[in-house]
């Protein structure tokens, strides 16, 4: 090393004994370069000793060669050291998580032990596959657990549990404690003070037959059941039968109903719709009964319960939440009836038929005892003595927070209360809710399941009175919910039979539902739930008495409800016979069917909360809009006679189609790993439903603003009905109203197209 140091010193002029000079100067008289190398102490010594010292001149090259080699070696060593330092520093800066300079093919020397140093292995985030998650869910679903939970919920501790009762509150606290035991990320409850209608405490309601002078001939019944939100009054009139009380039934009648009491069969449509239809034709009151043909119940004296509010939520705080001490002026929903309505037993209905004449049409397929109308010398007197009562209700919540987007969530819920035992109506749904909360919490804590988005479990209060708990929650937090909640799954009445699997849902969820039906097998047949490729055309609209309805029609949140059921309606809903024993007798495979319902809901939850892309198929609304345009084309002649045309509707429809196509292109080109880009696309998708809420009507006056699934003159169905009225009864047709309906419907579709396009500079429409 000393020799190398000496050589290095000599190279840079440290030693005066010798040096090397390279002359690269070009010759003046030629193009060739000349290189001259000299070794000397100095130039003078070199000249003086040039001839004299031959020996010295022979030995000097040896000194030079050794020094030069050492110098070159030193330079190379320093160069290599510098190169290695620079290379290692570069690796650490550019690839901090990789093993720099390590060859994957290197092997340890035999007979030597590796150094006792801790090696760094980078953590690669593992993402569970769909098959893994599906198996994880299936392994945790136990049929007996569902049966045990249903039994427990229908024990004496929680039955009966009418909304606001002590047993209803006890069950709410039990569910809250269960959520805490399941170790959900957060558990809470909110309370509302609402008005419901109950049976009168001072006087009974009654149905009597009277003569022309109003004197009582006979007491038919003092009903045990009742219809909440009926007008409390007394009316008298001729009794006429109107089958189920649908609009089509009234159109087929050969006698008027104005000024008369109407008796109708339960089923087909809700109690509230039956009353609204009768009131629109100036009937003075409505009686509702369950005929044996549709509801084959042995007990002819079985009482029935329901409600007559054509809407959801507390009807005395329409459009705003029923929190305590809210300072709103007294008001009431426009969906409350102005006529009395009462349920009666089948025995009471048959007693009334005994005084009536005219056989019911065979097309009604009802009991042989059915009759059409009272004779002219007799009437029926109806007295309803229901009372308003303010109660406190609870909604109970638990959440599993998402790991990447906790502020986006899917909500799954079930009604908790019931007028009777409520086994099929609320216990099955509540059991599903509890078991799914337990299972998903276990999947997260022990199975490695990491949902990207949050899952909210909700137990609703006062569901029997028109989804009051769910609606009040939506009204209270509407400003944030439509930005964050992207799907609601309803578990109410999920198991009512075994033959069929039926779904009611937003079109955005059709594709996801179809995939789920293909994955889940029917527990009885062993075949896939997906049996009919035309199932979408058989999907029924969500009804007013379904808790999923306000999510879709009021809040613009995609919602779905499903059930295992028979071809006929389950006869014991809303009666005192809705017990666990009756349910298990009518549905022998109750435990297995409940497990299958949980598997359906569970798979939906996984796909909605876990997948990078949001499983909402916005293309389905292209079909809905196209179908509406085709229906409108049938009235082109009428529209032309009014000096109107459908060009702007065609343009709006085209813009919506282009917007969906552009979004599909953006989605296909997006980098799945880029969560920011995917979130922006998903946010555009999740707001599609919301943009079909008409911005031109008041949420208070017309709370169900959805133009496809809502209720009111702003809906597309109301527009079509109005055009039909021009052909049937031109005197009742209002051209100004129709012009407004067409313009606002067109602009709502156009607004949805613009919103779906993204930023305003990306909007490219022909409107």
Swiss-Prot record:
<feature type="modified residue" description="Phosphoserine">
    <location>
        <position position="18"/>
    </location>
</feature>
<protein>
    <recommendedName>
        <fullName>Transferrin receptor protein 1</fullName>
    </recommendedName>
</protein>
<feature type="transmembrane region" description="Helical; Signal-anchor for type II membrane protein">
    <location>
        <begin position="68"/>
        <end position="88"/>
    </location>
</feature>
<feature type="short sequence motif" description="Stop-transfer sequence">
    <location>
        <begin position="60"/>
        <end position="63"/>
    </location>
</feature>
<keyword id="KW-0325">Glycoprotein</keyword>
<dbReference type="InterPro" id="IPR003137">
    <property type="entry name" value="PA_domain"/>
</dbReference>
<feature type="region of interest" description="Ligand-binding">
    <location>
        <begin position="576"/>
        <end position="767"/>
    </location>
</feature>
<keyword id="KW-0812">Transmembrane</keyword>
<keyword id="KW-1133">Transmembrane helix</keyword>
<feature type="topological domain" description="Cytoplasmic">
    <location>
        <begin position="1"/>
        <end position="67"/>
    </location>
</feature>
<dbReference type="InterPro" id="IPR036757">
    <property type="entry name" value="TFR-like_dimer_dom_sf"/>
</dbReference>
<keyword id="KW-0449">Lipoprotein</keyword>
<keyword id="KW-0597">Phosphoprotein</keyword>
<comment type="function">
    <text>Cellular uptake of iron occurs via receptor-mediated endocytosis of ligand-occupied transferrin receptor into specialized endosomes. Endosomal acidification leads to iron release. The apotransferrin-receptor complex is then recycled to the cell surface with a return to neutral pH and the concomitant loss of affinity of apotransferrin for its receptor. Transferrin receptor is necessary for development of erythrocytes and the nervous system. Positively regulates T and B cell proliferation through iron uptake.</text>
</comment>
<dbReference type="GO" id="GO:0033572">
    <property type="term" value="P:transferrin transport"/>
</dbReference>
<dbReference type="GO" id="GO:0006826">
    <property type="term" value="P:iron ion transport"/>
</dbReference>
<dbReference type="Pfam" id="PF04389">
    <property type="entry name" value="Peptidase_M28"/>
</dbReference>
<feature type="modified residue" description="Phosphoserine">
    <location>
        <position position="9"/>
    </location>
</feature>
<dbReference type="GO" id="GO:0009897">
    <property type="term" value="C:external side of plasma membrane"/>
</dbReference>
<feature type="glycosylation site" description="N-linked (GlcNAc...) asparagine">
    <location>
        <position position="734"/>
    </location>
</feature>
<dbReference type="GO" id="GO:0006879">
    <property type="term" value="P:intracellular iron ion homeostasis"/>
</dbReference>
<dbReference type="Pfam" id="PF04253">
    <property type="entry name" value="TFR_dimer"/>
</dbReference>
<dbReference type="InterPro" id="IPR037324">
    <property type="entry name" value="TfR1/2_PA"/>
</dbReference>
<keyword id="KW-1015">Disulfide bond</keyword>
<dbReference type="Pfam" id="PF02225">
    <property type="entry name" value="PA"/>
</dbReference>
<dbReference type="InterPro" id="IPR046450">
    <property type="entry name" value="PA_dom_sf"/>
</dbReference>
<feature type="domain" description="PA">
    <location>
        <begin position="230"/>
        <end position="320"/>
    </location>
</feature>
<dbReference type="GO" id="GO:0004998">
    <property type="term" value="F:transferrin receptor activity"/>
</dbReference>
<dbReference type="GO" id="GO:0030890">
    <property type="term" value="P:positive regulation of B cell proliferation"/>
</dbReference>
<feature type="modified residue" description="Phosphothreonine">
    <location>
        <position position="20"/>
    </location>
</feature>
<feature type="compositionally biased region" description="Acidic residues">
    <location>
        <begin position="111"/>
        <end position="121"/>
    </location>
</feature>
<dbReference type="InterPro" id="IPR007365">
    <property type="entry name" value="TFR-like_dimer_dom"/>
</dbReference>
<dbReference type="GO" id="GO:0042470">
    <property type="term" value="C:melanosome"/>
</dbReference>
<feature type="short sequence motif" description="Cell attachment site">
    <location>
        <begin position="653"/>
        <end position="655"/>
    </location>
</feature>
<feature type="short sequence motif" description="Endocytosis signal">
    <location>
        <begin position="19"/>
        <end position="22"/>
    </location>
</feature>
<dbReference type="InterPro" id="IPR007484">
    <property type="entry name" value="Peptidase_M28"/>
</dbReference>
<keyword id="KW-1003">Cell membrane</keyword>
<keyword id="KW-0675">Receptor</keyword>
<feature type="lipid moiety-binding region" description="S-palmitoyl cysteine">
    <location>
        <position position="69"/>
    </location>
</feature>
<dbReference type="InterPro" id="IPR039373">
    <property type="entry name" value="Peptidase_M28B"/>
</dbReference>
<keyword id="KW-0472">Membrane</keyword>
<dbReference type="GO" id="GO:0031623">
    <property type="term" value="P:receptor internalization"/>
</dbReference>
């Amino acid at each position: 090393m000393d020799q190398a140091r000496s050589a290095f010193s000599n190279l840079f002029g440290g030693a005066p004994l010798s040096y090397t000079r390279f002359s690269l100067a070009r010759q003046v008289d030629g193009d060739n370069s000349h290189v001259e190398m000299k070794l000397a102490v100095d130039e003078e010594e070199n000249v003086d000793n040039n001839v004299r010292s031959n020996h010295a001149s022979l030995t000097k090259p040896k000194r030079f060669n050794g020094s030069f080699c050492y110098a070159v070696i030193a330079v190379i060593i320093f160069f290599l050291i510098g190169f290695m330092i620079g290379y290692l520093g570069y690796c650490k800066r550019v690839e901090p998580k990789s093993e720099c300079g390590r060859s994957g093919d290197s092997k340890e020397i035999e007979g030597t032990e590796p150094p006792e140093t801790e090696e760094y292995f980078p953590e690669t985030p593992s993402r569970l596959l769909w098959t893994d998650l599906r198996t994880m869910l299936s392994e945790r679903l136990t049929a007996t657990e569902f049966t045990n939970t249903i039994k427990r919920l229908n024990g004496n501790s929680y039955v009966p549990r009418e909304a606001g009762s002590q047993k209803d509150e006890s069950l709410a606290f039990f569910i809250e404690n269960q959520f805490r035991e399941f170790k959900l990320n957060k558990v809470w409850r909110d309370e509302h003070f609402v008005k419901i209608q109950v049976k009168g405490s001072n006087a009974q309601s009654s149905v009597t037959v009277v003569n022309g002078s109003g004197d009582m001939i006979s007491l038919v019944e003092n009903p045990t059941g009742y219809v909440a939100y009926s007008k409390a009054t007394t009316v008298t009139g001729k009794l006429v039968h109107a089958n189920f009380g649908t609009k089509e039934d009234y159109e087929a009648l050969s006698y008027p109903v104005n000024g008369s009491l109407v008796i109708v069969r339960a089923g087909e449509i809700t109690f509230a719709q039956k009353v609204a239809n009768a009131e629109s034709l100036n009937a003075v009151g409505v009686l509702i009964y369950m005929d044996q043909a549709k509801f084959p119940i042995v007990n002819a004296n079985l009482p029935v319960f329901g409600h007559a509010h054509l809407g959801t939520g507390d009807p005395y705080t329409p459009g705003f939440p029923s929190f305590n001490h809210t300072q709103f002026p007294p008001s009431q929903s426009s969906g409350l009836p102005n006529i009395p309505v009462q349920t009666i037993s089948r025995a009471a209905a048959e007693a009334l038929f005994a005084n009536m004449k005219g056989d019911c049409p065979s097309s009604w397929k009802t009991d042989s005892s059915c009759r059409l109308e009272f004779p002219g010398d007799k009437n029926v007197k109806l007295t309803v003595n229901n009372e308003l009562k303010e109660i406190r209700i609870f909604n109970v919540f638990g959440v599993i927070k998402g790991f990447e987007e906790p502020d986006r969530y899917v909500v799954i819920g079930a009604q908790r209360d019931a007028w009777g035992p409520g086994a099929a109506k609320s216990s099955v749904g509540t059991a599903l809710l509890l078991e799914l909360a337990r299972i998903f919490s276990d999947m997260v804590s022990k199975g490695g399941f990491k949902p990207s988005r949050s899952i909210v479990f909700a137990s609703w209060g006062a569901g029997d009175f028109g989804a009051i708990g769910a609606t009040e929650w939506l009204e209270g937090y509407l400003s944030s919910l439509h930005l964050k909640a992207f799907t609601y799954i309803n578990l109410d009445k999920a198991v009512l039979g075994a033959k069929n699997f039926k779904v009611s849902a937003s079109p955005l969820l059709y594709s996801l539902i179809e995939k789920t039906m293909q994955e889940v097998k029917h527990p009885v047949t062993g075949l896939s739930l997906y049996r009919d490729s035309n199932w979408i055309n058989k999907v029924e609209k969500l009804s007013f008495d379904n808790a999923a309805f306000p999510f879709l029609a009021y809040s613009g949140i995609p919602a779905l409800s499903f059930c295992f059921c028979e071809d006929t309606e389950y006869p014991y809903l809303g009666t005192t016979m809705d017990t666990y024993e009756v349910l298990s007798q009518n549905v022998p495979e109750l435990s297995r069917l409940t497990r299958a319902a949980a598997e359906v809901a569970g798979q939906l939850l996984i796909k909605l909360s876990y997948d990078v892309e949001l499983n909402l198929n916005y293309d389905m609304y292209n079909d809905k809009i196209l179908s509406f345009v085709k229906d409108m084309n049938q009235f082109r002649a009428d529209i032309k006679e009014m000096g109107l045309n459908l060009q702007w509707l065609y343009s709006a429809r085209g813009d919506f189609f282009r917007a969906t196509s552009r979004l599909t292109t953006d989605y296909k080109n997006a980098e799945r790993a880029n969560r920011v880009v995917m979130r922006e696309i998903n946010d555009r998708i999740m707001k599609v439903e919301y943009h079909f809420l008409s911005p031109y009507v008041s949420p208070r006056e017309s709370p169900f603003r959805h133009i496809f699934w809502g209720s009111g003159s702003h809906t597309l169905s109301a527009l079509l009905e109005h055009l039909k009225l021009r052909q049937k009864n031109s005197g009742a047709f209002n051209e100004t109203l129709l012009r407004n309906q067409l313009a606002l419907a067109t602009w709502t579709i156009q607004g949805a197209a613009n919103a779906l396009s993204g930023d305003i500079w990306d909007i490219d429409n022909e409107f």
